[in-house]
Amino acid sequence: MFKPELLSPAGTLKNMRYAFAYGADAVYAGQPRYSLRVRNNEFNHENLQLGINEAHALGKKFYVVVNIAPHNAKLKTFIRDLKPVVEMGPDALIMSDPGLIMLVREHFPQMDIHLSVQANAVNWATVKFWQQMGLTRVILSRELSLEEIAEIREQVPEMELEIFVHGALCMAYSGRCLLSGYINKRDPNQGTCTNACRWEYKVQEGKEDSIGNIVHIHEPIPVQTVEPTLGIGAPTDKVFMIEEAQRPGEYMTAFEDEHGTYIMNSKDLRAIQHVERLTKMGVHSLKIEGRTKSFYYCARTAQVYRRAIDDAAAGKPFDPSLLETLEGLAHRGYTEGFLRRHTHDDYQNYDYGYSVSDRQQFVGEFTGERNGALAAVAVKNKFSLGDSLELMTPQGNVSFTLEHMENAKGEKMEVAPGDGYTIWMPVPEDLALDFALLMRNFSGQTTRNPHGK
């Protein structure tokens, strides 16, 4: 039966290796200077070659992202800089700019090109156009519903389609955001996004003065005291002034009716419950977003979505426990995005801009070292004797209560203090620990206060 590709992020070689170990079929990584991951990118030429070689040795695929919106200066060096990357043998380039696509088609006609989500493909005519231009896959816009995706699949059956199913969402349309550039001169469309939409803002009512300028009415009031109305009350025609917490006196005008602490702060996408339907549609690739994400995130999302894809391909019903498993990842609240219609407050988090989980925290990475029945764990976050833990491996997961651990000298320990420590704990000797990770289950705590009561 048809089985879609599971496509994971690879901001680092380590992330890539964990994604592959836990079931990803392919990964994507940005090319230096020409992707939107300039600030969060380990992949220089040496690592790109390593990544591509390792992927192919495993029978997996590696896509290189070249989706920048270039100014003239970057056109001068583009083909020169891209040539060695193409020679490395990536399975495709992910691109958005028509001019760069034209140059690649002229100079490297054999190179597969996937249309980036930044190109904003929202209808079947656009998909058909890019098919006629020689592209082999289109990453559809996040703003599409399930019904619209199905219609595109029906109208253009020969074109490969890719859909985002998990990860952070931009408040800007298809990610084409100007906020970071406006506030601190870091252009998101040049790969230097500072996630300004996640910062804390204050809001106050504004008004139009006699010459048409928007000015504030009174002193700023912390927006935490303003009740959100979007999606649950009547729309407002008021004007609001927005002040970023670290830039007092600098105001931006907002004509929308978003009222909340982090008024531009989207919830995170989670569409695992729709994997079965997307599989039946014939969507070729299900993609996980991963800017600034850890190897633990890459491993956990790959493991969970691998299970969902395999179940869908085998004709098994969706397992709701997978939704609960994803709650163990720190997130800003989950949404189905635009796949189904919701009220606006289902898309946006009004309360906080950070990622948090009240289910689990990643606390350790198994190093692979063994001493009889004991195995070494590189501690990442504090945990203690008596804690409920989950040992996660590519072969399966095991939950248990920690009853014993010791240091390298064989001395018993009650607490693994945190990052930088190595402890030894009992693990069955027949359990393979390659890429094994350790999580602590919460009971009334969160990742923001993991040891509170």
Per-range role (PLM):
Residues 108:
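Conserved phosphotransfer cores of two-component systems
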Residues 37-54:
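Glycine-rich, positively charged N-terminal anion/phosphate-binding segment
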Residues 1-21, 26-33, 52, 58-68, ...:
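Surface-exposed amphipathic alpha-helical tracts and adjacent flexible/coil segments at the periphery
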Residues 123-125:
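Conserved nucleotide-cofactor-binding alpha/beta core module
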Residues 99-100:
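Alpha-helix capping/helix-boundary segments
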